[in-house]
Every structure is written in C-alpha cells, then in structure tokens.
Swiss-Prot record:
Subunit structure: Component of the large ribosomal subunit.
SMART domains from the UniProt entry: Ribosomal_L19e
Encoding gene per record: rpl19
Species: Xenopus laevis
Compartments it resides in: Cytoplasm
BP GO annotations: translation
Iron among keywords: no
Protein name as annotated: Large ribosomal subunit protein eL19
Keyword Ribosomal protein annotated: yes
Amino acid sequence: MSMLRLQKRLASSVLRCGKKKVWLDPNETNEIANANSRQQIRKLVKDGLIIRKPVTVHSRARCRKNTLARRKGRHMGIGKRKGTANARMPEKLSWMRRMRILRRLLRRYRESKKIDRHMYHSLYLKVKGNVFKNKRILMEHIHKLKADKARKKLLADQAEARRSKTKEARKRREERLQAKKEEIIKSLSKEEESGKK
C-alpha cells in the first residue's frame, strides 16, 4: 500500500477542510497515488474517489433537556453548587434590579398624579434606605399612606364642621340673649313711662 499523505493534504486544500475529514477510496489507492497535482485531485473528487466526510453530529438534545430541568429547579441542590451565593447571584445585581423596579414604580405613580412630589421624595429616600423588600410592599405602603392622609383630612373636615357649628350656635345664643335683654329693657322703660304718667 502506497503512502497517500500528499494526496490527503492536497485534497484537504481543494475541499477546504481538515485532513481528517478527507476520505480516500481504499479500492482505488493506485489511481489516487498517481495523482500528484491539485488538478488531478479535483478530477478524483469529481469522480467520487475522494470525498469530504460529513460533519460529526454534536447533539444538544441532552443539554436542552437538562437546561429545562434546571429551570424547574432540578440538579440545583446543595451538592451541585460550586460558587458562593454571591458568586452565583451577585448581591449588587439583585440590589440594582430591585432599585430600578421600585424607582420606576415611584416615577410612574408621580407622573400619573397618584402621589405628589413630596411623598415621592420621602419614598425615594426610603427605597434607597432598603425599607421596602419588593414592589408589593411599596405599593401597600403607598395605599396605606394615602388612606391615612384621606382619614386625617376627613377628621379635620369633621372637626372644622363641628367648630363652625358650635360657633354658629354660640352666635345664635348670644343674639337671642341680646334680643331678650333688649326686650326686657324695652318693657322696663315702658313700665317706667306708664308709672310716671
């Protein structure tokens, strides 16, 4: 059997692939051995004596299956973990995500006039101070603040109404007393006049 190293090298150059991807027909070794130029190699390729092997299949099916399982939380237990908790999910990244979510919510509420700029500013600072763990807690806090504000306003209005009512009653009572005094004075003056006559 003759050496076909040259032919393999030329074939890999002609077929634009690696030498291990070149298949030389073992039944036609003599004919292949006679070919010592690229032109002759091209002819052999055309005749089918030299073939480029297909790409080896490297399936990702198992990998996809495992990835789907991991999304469900499989193969992610204590024994499978290599890095620290901070390496697996950086605290800074989770903090940034939380800040962006909460600040976006505050901005949206301010633009839609659900909260005024004073409340926005105080809540913004509280968000920065790590008061709210997530969006739901912040929303509940805002609703509570608004309810408290409405309740205070209602109580203030009721107190004001009560004050004005008592004021009016006092005024009417004073007017009645004044009118009574005037009547008494008038009746006394009339009696005095009749007594003089």
